[in-house]
């Protein structure tokens, strides 16, 4: 088979006929805290630090190519896990295409109204996954196209069973530059459309994309809608503690544990749930701690709040204040740019009492919450 790229100008095809060391799985790294609320003043709850390896249908129109106050205390209890071992804790807690001319034809809508515009994007639908085949667009000898992702897994054309040669469909590539494609999450509510060159960038940060399990370092591969995040945590990560109120104490125990460790707690206030994370990483020549707050919500909702972390004791005070991050962004994105409270092990021990580190957490609402 000749592997060289053959450039073939194809006429615009007819419309296609085809239109989810540590505790593994869910119990793994989220044995860090208990998903139970506590209203008792001064009540102590156990949180578990975890050792780990550290982890359309959419109408499309042709573009200009055409001629047209009280602190509740939550205490953490470490779960020591060696690499490779699992430990537990007694916590209750497109159809056929013609191969004709070298010219891309202008496709005109039947009329100028939006409702009657031609769904050009559907011409690019992959017959396998129904996503869009975007430039460079490859075709079989009969002119059928398939997206790059599916093509790498196929040995023959899914439409005609012919050979999948390295033939580019230049006509479709030219047409693609004149089409606005809907976001892949349009069925989830995203109304945006994009030129194919900016489609992937948007989708990587789209507010309508599925949410990952927010537990840091967890092996949990769960994906779901925002409304399903808290039920998922309640039923599958039952060891995460939830404290009520806008002003609490997050107590991390045994901060001297070796290796990478996470402490996690939930805080409920203002009708929202926030995830408090303290992560320790092994970095030469010292251990580094990262503390931050995430909102179980969208980025727009997160902008309505400010959180304050404070280490206080031994005539010292260390404070960090910022807007919480949405769980869509994740813990690691904040750590990567140090958008969190960062301190070394010497600082941690200077504020610790008997190996336990208390962090005062205050959440404030800066403007009315957006649902």
Curated annotation (Swiss-Prot):
Binding site for Zn(2+) 2: 213, 220, 232, 237
GO process annotations (BP): proteasome-mediated ubiquitin-dependent protein catabolic process; protein ubiquitination
GO molecular function: ubiquitin conjugating enzyme binding; ubiquitin protein ligase activity; zinc ion binding
Tissue-level expression: Widely expressed. Colocalizes with SmRXR1 and SmRXR2 in vitelline cells.
Superkingdom field: Eukaryota
Keywords: Metal-binding, Transferase, Ubl conjugation pathway, Zinc, Zinc-finger
Entry keyword annotation includes Zinc: yes
Residue segments, region SBD: 175-366
EC number: 2.3.2.27
UniProt binding sites for Zn(2+) 1: 183, 190, 202, 206
Protein's pathway: Protein modification; protein ubiquitination
Zinc finger (RING-type): 126-161
Catalyzed reactions: S-ubiquitinyl-[E2 ubiquitin-conjugating enzyme]-L-cysteine + [acceptor protein]-L-lysine = [E2 ubiquitin-conjugating enzyme]-L-cysteine + N(6)-ubiquitinyl-[acceptor protein]-L-lysine
Zinc finger residue extent: SIAH-type: 178-238
GO cellular component: cytoplasm
Domain free text: The RING-type zinc finger domain is essential for ubiquitin ligase activity.
Function: E3 ubiquitin-protein ligase that mediates ubiquitination and subsequent proteasomal degradation of target proteins. E3 ubiquitin ligases accept ubiquitin from an E2 ubiquitin-conjugating enzyme in the form of a thioester and then directly transfers the ubiquitin to targeted substrates. Mediates the ubiquitin-mediated degradation of nuclear receptors for retinoids SmRXR1 and SmRXR2.
Family affiliation: Belongs to the SINA (Seven in absentia) family.
Subunit structure: Homodimer.
Name the record gives this protein: E3 ubiquitin-protein ligase sina
Organism: Schistosoma mansoni (Blood fluke)
């Amino acid at each position: 088979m000749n592997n060289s790229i053959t450039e073939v100008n194809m006429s615009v095809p007819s419309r296609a006929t085809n239109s989810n060391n540590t505790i593994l799985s869910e119990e793994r790294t989220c044995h860090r805290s208990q998903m139970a609320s506590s209203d008792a003043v001064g009540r102590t709850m156990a949180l578990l630090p975890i050792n780990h390896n550290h982890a359309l249908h959419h109408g499309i129109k042709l573009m200009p190519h055409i001629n047209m106050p009280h602190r509740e205390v939550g205490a953490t209890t470490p779960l020591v896990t060696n690499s490779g071992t699992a430990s537990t804790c007694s916590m209750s807690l497109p159809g056929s295409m013609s191969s004709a001319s070298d010219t891309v034809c202008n496709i005109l809508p039947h009329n100028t109204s939006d409702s009657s515009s031609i769904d050009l994007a559907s011409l690019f639908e992959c017959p396998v996954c129904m996503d869009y085949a975007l430039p460079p667009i490859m075709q079989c000898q009969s002119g059928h196209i398939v997206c790059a992702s599916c093509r790498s897994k196929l040995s023959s054309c899914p439409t005609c069973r012919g050979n999948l040669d390295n033939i580019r469909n230049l006509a479709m590539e030219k047409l693609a530059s004149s089409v606005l494609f809907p976001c892949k999450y349009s069925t989830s509510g995203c109304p945006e459309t994009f030129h194919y060159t900016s489609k992937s960038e948007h989708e990587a940060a789209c507010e309508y994309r599925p949410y990952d399990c927010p537990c840091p370092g967890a092996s949990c591969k769960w994906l779901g809608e925002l409304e399903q995040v808290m039920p998922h945590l309640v039923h599958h990560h039952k060891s995460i503690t939830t404290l009520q109120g806008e002003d609490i104490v997050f107590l991390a125990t045994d901060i001297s544990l070796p290796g990478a460790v996470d402490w996690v707690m939930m805080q409920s206030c203002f009708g929202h749930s926030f995830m408090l994370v303290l992560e320790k990483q092994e970095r030469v020549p010292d251990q580094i701690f990262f503390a931050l707050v995430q909102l179980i919500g969208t980025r727009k909702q997160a902008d309505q709040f400010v959180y304050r972390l404070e280490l206080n004791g031994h005539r010292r005070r260390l404070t960090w204040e910022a807007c919480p991050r949405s769980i869509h962004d994740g813990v690691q994105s904040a750590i990567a740019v140090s958008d969190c409270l960062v301190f070394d092990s010497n600082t941690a021990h200077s504020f610790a009492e008997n190996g336990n580190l208390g962090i005062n957490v205050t959440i404030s609402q800066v403007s009315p919450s957006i649902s």
